[in-house]
From Swiss-Prot:
Organism: Caldicellulosiruptor saccharolyticus (strain ATCC 43494 / DSM 8903 / Tp8T 6331)
Annotated protein name in UniProt: UDP-N-acetylmuramoylalanine--D-glutamate ligase
Role summary: Cell wall formation. Catalyzes the addition of glutamate to the nucleotide precursor UDP-N-acetylmuramoyl-L-alanine (UMA).
Enzyme category, top tier: ligase
Top-level taxonomy: Bacteria, Bacillati, Bacillota, Bacillota incertae sedis, Caldicellulosiruptorales
Similarity field: Belongs to the MurCDEF family.
Length: 453
């Protein structure tokens, strides 16, 4: 693919947008950058970085003429395909792709493990990377995890193994992207404000299998009703994982106290499930998925076992922060939907003080409210969805909730009522964009406020 002299419009100036602009400029493209923010809303340092790589820069509104004269459009994951300028580009026959697709077209290595799903993506992606790094020298973990794929393609070789976390938004804009291993961890309602309905969301996730050939592998969760039904759409060799016993070839499963793998007709014991360092049933699921993703690499069970005994999880996912007077504080800012936060609540058998609420993605809180009533002694609600969650709690007669203005107030009040043995858990069940730049910022502020107590 020759970019020299091509006019490429890059839409969205977050991490992947800036990385795409940098790459395109280096390869001789004429780069036009656009972000919907007003110029005064963008940080000075960010603007200065963009100007290094952009020949033209637009804020807030994009003239149709700019789209009309572009040879290609590269969009960031946060940009909906329904935007006027995207629709116009399609109408004009201009190719619209994302950073993942752009990176793939310049990637020399075909050793790509791509992982998607509603929940568990970051933990599983990181874990797969840790297992592979025990055996292979050149393993790169990137993607939606916070490190754009495009930043690493030029330094890669034929032997590089990429482990890429991919969101449904990123999968919407692939065309030729073909992983060696594609995995869907689970699918539950999420991002319905963007995808409009579950069918569209499922179709976006399924695209991870779209270009896999006979030499590739599709990894699926048999314990999730939606992903189980996708087995007929999976391509290449299908690998399944389940917390239940299985006699299926090419599978990872639990039998009694042990995790087993069945690959190429050979059944092997991997480890005791209770030896996994990370707590919670959801992390058992993430572990099984990770073992499934590395099956094609034929790694010794002892190496996998050692990694899983040592792996402590990822930041913002049921992350232990501090214990004060017998009260433990956990940061689960990555709980951005009710399924993820439900799993966090179910990870504890002690009284929980919950901090929840945030940006409204259109999800129902009915089931989540019932679980709160069973597991939570008090919940502090904040953000755009606080009234929506409160309404569901009131419907079932649960009144132990309180509205707070911000996260600092929530932490302070939680500590004031907590008793020895309690857990204070930030698990919002919502995205962060109403009050914070990202779930990472929300989680780090939570940790800051806890450490200031």
């Amino acid at each position: 693919m020759d970019l020299f002299g091509k006019k490429v419009l890059v839409i969205g100036m977050g991490k992947s947008g800036i990385s795409s602009a940098r790459f395109l400029k280096k390869h001789g493209a004429y780069v036009v950058a656009f972000d919907e923010k007003r110029e005064d809303e963008m940080k000075t340092q960010q603007k200065e970085t963009i100007r290094k790589f952009a020949d033209e820069l637009y804020f807030n509104d994009l003239p149709d003429a700019v789209v009309d004269t572009s040879d290609m459009v590269v969009i960031s994951p946060g940009v909906p395909l329904t935007k006027r300028y995207i629709t116009l580009a399609h109408k004009r026959g201009i190719e619209v792709i994302g950073e993942i697709e752009l990176a793939y077209r310049f990637c020399r290595s075909k050793n790509i493990v791509a992982i998607t799903g509603t929940n568990g993506k970051t933990t599983t992606t990181t874990l797969v990377g840790e297992i592979l790094k025990k055996v292979f020298d050149n393993v790169i973990v990137c993607g939606n995890i916070g490190f754009p794929f495009i930043d690493y393609v030029e330094s890669s070789t034929d032997d590089t193994i990429f482990v890429i976390e991919i969101s449904s938004f990123q999968l919407e804009t692939i065309k030729y992207f073909k992983p060696m291993v594609g995995c869907i961890l689970n699918i539950t309602p999420d991002h319905l404000n963007r995808h409009m309905n579950m069918d569209n969301y499922i179709r976006a996730k399924m695209r991870i299998f779209e270009n896999i050939d006979q030499e590739g592998y599709s990894v699926l969760n048999m314990d999730n009703s939606i992903t189980r039904d996708l087995i007929g759409c999976a391509k290449g060799t299908v690998i399944t994982f389940s917390k239940n016993e299985s006699d299926t070839q090419n599978s990872v499963f639990v039998d009694g106290d042990f995790i087993y793998r069945n690959f190429l007709g050979k059944v092997e014991k991997v480890m005791r499930k209770d030896d996994i360092f990370m707590p919670g049933e959801h992390n058992l699921e993430n572990t099984l998925a990770a073992i499934g993703c590395v099956l094609p690499f034929e790694i010794q069970p002892s190496i996998i076992e050692k990694t899983l005994k040592e792996f402590k999880g990822v930041e913002h996912r049921i992350e232990f922060v501090r214990e004060i007077n017998g009260v433990r504080f956990y940061n689960d800012s990555k709980g951005t939907n009710t399924d993820a936060s439900s799993k966090a609540l179910n990870s504890f058998e002690v009284p929980i003080i919950l901090i929840a609420g945030g940006y409204d993605k259109g999800e129902s809180f009915e089931k989540f409210a019932k679980l709160i009533s069973q597991k939570v002694k008090k919940v502090f609600l904040l953000g755009q969805t606080k009234q929506k969650i409160a309404d569901q709690l009131q419907k079932i007669g649960y009144l132990n909730f309180e509205f707070v203005e911000d996260l600092k107030e929530a932490v302070k009040k939680s500590f004031e009522i907590a008793k020895e043995g309690d857990v204070v858990l930030l698990s919002p069940a919502c995205a962060s964009w109403d009050m914070f730049e990202s779930y990472e910022q929300r989680g780090r502020l939570f940790k800051q406020y806890v450490n200031e107590l």
